[in-house]
Amino acid sequence: EEATLVVTAGTTMYGLTELGGLVSGESVVVIGPGPIGLLGVAIAKSLGASPVSLIGTRNDRLEIGKKLGADYVFNVKEEKNIVEAVKKKVSNLGVDYVIECAGTEQALNDAILMTNRGGKICLAAFPHKAVKINIPHMVINNIYMYGIRGEGKSATHRAMTFMKEKKTILK
């Protein structure tokens, strides 16, 4: 059970640190409260991201996200405009990082629109077919989008050490 958590945490850690260069104090939004998304909340918070927000459709998963460190949770079904709701709570300019774990066209475009100029979007999930995304907005705002497929040995080792030190992730 813990080994599965380490591999999943390693994926998120790799996306935030190795590829994303997360700096303490930067804002992170996680879209999709599945295993990668929930551990993304815990890892981002433990790395010093602030605030950390979680977006999803299931209140039970959003509650778990709060316990793992989410400062704000948003239920897409309860928000008229999720991008505006996030910007209102976090920053009118947008967020520094989005970890996209839902894999839907809507989630991808919401991620693009809520990301601050110069911000980063980490794709941890992907749609099962081609989708249209707002490339002009990304280019105009210098938004960097990258994907993660796996965690890599070094990130898994770092995640294991990190999780031993930050035992709250495992509780």
PLM segments and residue spans:
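Generic hydrophobic/aromatic pocket-lining and core-packing "Φ" positions
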Residues: V41, L62, L108-I112, I135
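Glycine-centered, small-residue-biased loops immediately flanking beta-strands
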Residues: E26, G119-K120
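A short helix->loop->beta-strand "cap" motif at the edges of active sites that frequently abuts
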Residues: A49-S50, G119, N141-I143
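Mid-domain Rossmann-like dinucleotide-binding core that forms the NAD(H)/NADP(H) cofactor-binding site
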Residues: E2-E79, E84
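N-terminal Rossmann-like NAD(P) cofactor-binding module of classical short-chain dehydrogenase/reductase
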Residues: D96-I99
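Acidic carboxylate diad motif detector
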Residues: A124-A125
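C-terminal substrate-binding/catalytic core of Rossmann-like NAD(P)-dependent dehydrogenases/reductases
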Residues: V83-K88, N92, H128-K171
